[in-house]
Amino acid sequence: MESPQAKKSGLNLPAGMSTITSLRLETLSTPPSSASPRAISNLSSTPSPSKSSKCSDRFIPCRSSSRLHTFGLIDNQSPVKEGSNEAYNRLLKSELFGPDFASPSSSPAGCGVGSPLVSPSKNMLRFKTESCGPSSPFSPSIFGRNDGFCNEGFTPPKPPRKVPKTPHKVLDAPSLQDDFYLNLVDWSSQNTLAVGLGTCVYLWSASNSKVTKLCDLGPYDGVCSVQWTKEGSFISIGTNGGQVQIWDGTKCKKVRTMGGHQTRTGVLAWNSRILASGSRDRNILQHDMRVPSDFIGKLVGHKSEVCGLKWSCDDRELASGGNDNQLLVWNQHSQQPTLRLTEHTAAVKAIAWSPHQSNLLVSGGGTADRCIRFWNTTNGHQLNSVDTGSQVCNLAWSKNVNELVSTHGYSQNQIMVWKYPSLAKVATLTGHSMRVLYLAMSPDGQTIVTGAGDETLRFWNVFPSMKTPAPVKDTGLWSLGRTQIR
């Protein structure tokens, strides 16, 4: 039976609590419709008897036994750490959901746990390719990736150029001498290869593989050097007796014989009109085909045999190397060397001028030196050097790309291709069983031929073809280009 107090208060209380506790509600001054949870106050209980209750419908924790002080051990993150975490979160979102998701302007300021994973303004399906361009500093395109979002602007790195490791042609060259100081192979601008074999000079046409015997010097003489003119129609031959012979390569006819050297002429070099010859007599002679005298100039500076000669690309300077370990640079208007470079510690036979940069000269030393050195002939400073680990026999610069090739002796007898100015190795080619003493380049600049004492000539495809510039299109009469009236 309900107690009178319970019936009066309108509360349904358990039977056991009808006489134990009593609740008192204060009268509210505001109408019930506008009451808020805070309007109910002063819930108090009347003093309970000494007998405690055995059950209750609420659980009130004991604050005295709670370890509330442990929450104070959590340190607030520093602004620097919070900034780094924010940057990492934006970058991660950008990688996963695209660059627009990581943009601070595209995301609401109050983005919290309940925020959607995609922007409300974005559709789930995309029906067109979006334009490229990073919308935030955390866009993937800045870091070299743009997977699936903007592939048009991403350029993959170029793979390294592959150079064939084997020669595409091998020719027998019997009686090809194994002498470091001779220069017995040259390739003309008309695609004809000249080779000195013993007392004879042979011509091999790269166009039709036809072999022609140009001359035979006889049993008491020998071929020490060959060199084509720039036009490729005449060839000069240095002999063991010190003479220089000029031959017409098309008619196989001797044009002239010039003397002046006391002993063998081991190196020759043509510019537009002057032929320079170096000899074991330590002298360099300058010959002019237009005058009747044997030579027009004599350059004295080396203390031993001259074994390397090269004219610069503009025909203004002549570089000479000798067995005295010296590299000399001569001006065409002076009888004295303008530069005397003595850093090499062995004979300097390998010499080459860069066709891509004026006043850039490269030289290589013999067995005791093994270094390739780069020079600025304007001030005589050494720009760089690299130790190849073996005798440097020849050097040639590519006219198609900024690379050069070197041939070497003991112990690998290798051919090496270098990238300039990084001096990174592009390729290392092997095949000769003896030191690679002779080197020449084809007219198109793609193929080199190497010769060695193993009596073989090997042809290698080393350099790429020259890129032809795109023709300039005339946009009409009012174009900014030059027009011809008549």
Curated annotation (Swiss-Prot):
Domain of life: Eukaryota
Motif extent (PEST motif): 24-36
Pathway(s) of this molecule: Protein modification; protein ubiquitination
One GO term of the biological process aspect: protein ubiquitination
Molecular function (Gene Ontology), one example: anaphase-promoting complex binding
WD repeats: 177-214, 218-257, 260-297, 301-340, 343-385, 387-428, 431-470
Keyword flag Transferase: no
Induction: Expression restricted to late G2-phase and M-phase during the cell cycle.
Alphabetized UniProt keyword annotations: Cell cycle, Cell division, Mitosis, Repeat, WD repeat
Family classification: Belongs to the WD repeat CDC20/Fizzy family.
Protein name: B-type cell cycle switch protein ccs52B
Organism: Medicago truncatula
UniProt gene name: CCS52B
